[in-house]
Amino acid sequence: MPGLLVIMGSGETAPTMVKPHRSIFERVGDRPAILLDTPYGFQSNADDISARAVSYFAASVGRTVEVANWRTNLAPGLARERALASLRTAAWLFAGPGSPTYALRHWRDTPLPAALLDTLNRDGVVVMASAAALTLGSHTVPVYEIYKAGIEPYWEPGLDLVRLSCGLPAVVIPHYDNAEGGHHDTRFCYLGEGRLAAMERELPEESFVLGVDEHKLSLIHI
């Protein structure tokens, strides 16, 4: 069975995603399942976020999920090796909400991206939702910096995991149909049409945007 890359647009721990999660876990059997806490590792309530996610998977999906602590760019040593050991034995890896640029800052130039690819190459499942999903492409939307801090739109280099796993030069944008802004356009992960159009012109010619709507998912069989 090939590996499976799952990209969720939002709602990763909502009732709407219970059935998809159960279906995905059927591929994994009783092999280990690991939640990666990096994207929200900067938040003071990170432990609570992890606990709620673990409870969701146990109570709603019926699966035990362990947490791999990788909240900073772990220096070589016991803590990093312990986290990597968990990742390397997992058949299901999940990362979700938080800040994509924070996650990238602590994943780049570490063995973690290779561990994600290894999971896919071992017929495992990698599930990336919301902020974590933004890191998967060749370029990443720095959503907090643009939407919250008012920085001029720019692209952050992504992990390029989609290209490395299946050859597609994709730029992943979750929350694609977001409507929280009401009359203000917050589609395309809060960028709006105008900003996304301008940013697309800065992408390499071969790149394309893979948009995933909220409470929807994209499955890429590796």
Question: What function would you assign to each model-found segment?
Answer:
Residues 1-96:
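N-terminal beta1-alpha1 cap of cysteine-dependent amidohydrolase-like domains
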Residues 33, 93, 130, 172, ...:
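A residue-level signal for conserved active-site and pocket-lining positions in enzyme catalytic cores
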Residues 168, 173-203, 212-214:
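A conserved mid-domain beta-alpha-beta active-site/ligand-binding segment of alpha/beta enzyme cores
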